[in-house]
């Protein structure tokens, strides 16, 4: 059983041949670690979150950038509005948006994950829709928002003082 107050996160690079190739695996482990909060799944038992470089998939493309803030121009305007919203409410709305997308737009599961009443989750999603103009029925728009959240998380991990 795991301590629920202790969060363990790790990134792992690929297995390499010879000590000479360890720096490459270490670099991959760091890149995987950047995505542990974004693409890694939290185990049901609260155990450690581990992101393997081999499992990054499309996120490997984003690793190629030396400065993730270069990606800001690709973040949807509505999501930028949400990130520019006043701080206390902004954090709740972003957390709700992430949970909503992670749960495939299922409000019941979103409410459960956030330990809030169903109507609270509905209210927050409606507020996000009104504030950002995001159309959750448009798959392309939802994908753009999901990628935008990844970009913001990368920047946050890259430079803790950015947001």
Residue ranges and their predicted role:
Residues 1-163:
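Cytosolic nucleotide-utilizing catalytic cores of signal-transduction proteins
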């Amino acid at each position: 059983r795991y301590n629920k107050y202790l969060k363990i996160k790790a990134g792992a690079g690929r297995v390499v041949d010879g000590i000479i190739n360890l720096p490459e695996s270490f670099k991959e482990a760091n890149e995987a670690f950047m995505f542990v909060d974004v693409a890694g799944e939290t185990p049901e038992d609260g155990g450690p979150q581990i992101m393997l470089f081999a499992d990054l998939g499309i996120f490997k493309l984003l690793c190629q950038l030396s400065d993730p803030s270069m990606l800001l121009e690709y973040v949807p305007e509505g999501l930028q509005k949400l990130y520019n919203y006043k701080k206390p409410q902004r954090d709740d709305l972003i957390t709700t948006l992430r949970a909503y997308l992670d749960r495939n737009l299922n409000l019941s599961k979103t409410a459960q994950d956030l330990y809030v009443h169903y109507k609270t989750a509905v209210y927050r999603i409606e507020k996000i829709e009104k504030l950002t103009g995001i159309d959750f029925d448009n798959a392309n728009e939802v994908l753009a928002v999901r990628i935008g959240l990844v970009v913001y998380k990368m920047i946050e991990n890259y430079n803790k003082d950015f947001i």
